[in-house]
């Protein structure tokens, strides 16, 4: 199909043998030039140019905004949307848990105290195999176990 379009673009009044009518008669098919001509576009290979990649310079101290990104987009100078009393509560009581060591100690003490409480309140005979039979066995239909 593409070769047919290129022939039509080159020769406007071309006649192609054997395409129309009977192949035995050899009737000729005339092709009208198409309005949209096929124009191949020249493709040039351009190298990729980085803004800060010239001469192995990837970090520009004069232009830190473009080098590292605009970090002030994420910050906000607006007042806190939370209640001041709520903010004060969490700043006061959550401050000891900001350090990993203090949080780990709290979890160890909490887990140890929970384990101590559960072991002190549980009974030793929880499993039925340790309790044994609670009632005498019932005899079967023939008087046997």
Swiss-Prot record:
It is found in: Plastid, Chloroplast thylakoid membrane. It holds the Pfam family PSI_PsaH. Its main location: plastid. Keywords: Chloroplast, Membrane, Photosynthesis, Photosystem I, Plastid, Thylakoid, Transit peptide, Transmembrane, Transmembrane helix. The keyword DNA damage does not apply. Residues 1-50 form a transit peptide. Belongs to the psaH family. This is Photosystem I reaction center subunit VI-1, chloroplastic. The gene is PSAH1.
